[in-house]
Amino acid sequence: MLKLNPFRTILLTILCLSAIPPGFADEQKVKLEYPASNLESDDYLAPAGWNLVWSDEFTADVVDPDNWTRQVEPAGRFNGEWQRYTDNVENAYIDNGCLVIKAIHTSDHHGMNQYTSARLNTAGKFAWKHGKVVARMQLPYGAGTWPAFWMLGANIDENGGDTPWPQSGEIDIMEFYGAKDNAAVEANIHFAGANNQHQHMGAKKFRLEEGWFADAFHVFEMEWNEEMITWSV
C-alpha cells in the first residue's frame, strides 16, 4: 500500500447486512488485464515517482497487532448489521499469505447477534492524508454480504477522537453489496453538509465484464491529491 502524510485512518471490514444503498450514476466496465488470482505474478510494485511508506503483505503467522486493531463492537452498532465484531482469531486470521476476514454463524436466532465477524483498522497506529491506497482482495458473494475497504477521519469518536461521523469524513475505496450485484463494486464519499447533515457523493461504480468479484483476486486503488480523488479496479 502507498500512502503519504498523516491524517486519515484506513479501515478494512466485512459486514453481513441487508440494506441497499442509493444507485450510482457513473458506471465503468472492468476488463481484467492479467490473472489477478496468480499470487506469484501479482506482487504490487510502487509506480514511478511514488515511495512506499507502509504495507502489510500478511506473511506472518498471525494478524500483526502493530499494524491492525481488532475493533470490538456490538451487533447493529453502525448499520444495523446482524453480526457483532470480535477480537477472536477465528474471525480474522492469516492463511497462505492472505488476510481472511470471516463471518461465522453462531446462533439460529433471527436478526441481531446471530453472526460474529471482524472489523480491522489502523486507528492510533497509522494515518495518511493524500497518496495512493491499494489492496488486493477476493470478495465473498451472495445476499447479506457487505465487505468494504475504506478510510475514516483519524479524529472520529468511535476510535477515541472528538469528532462524530459524518463530520469526520469517509472515503469508501471499495464497497460490495451482495444483495445487489455480485459483479459490481462501488466507491463513495461521505461528509457533513449544512447543519452537519449527512451528505454523500455517489462517485463511481465498477462492473466486471464477465464473472464475479468472488471468482479471483482484484486490485482496488484510490489516489487522493489536493484536487481530486481517483478510483480504479
Whereabouts are the PLM-identified features?
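GH16 jelly-roll
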Residues: 26-233
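Bacterial N-terminal signal peptides
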Residues: 10-19
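Bacterial N-terminal signal peptides that target proteins for export
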Residues: 1-10
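Sec/Tat signal peptide C-region and signal peptidase I cleavage site
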Residues: 21-24
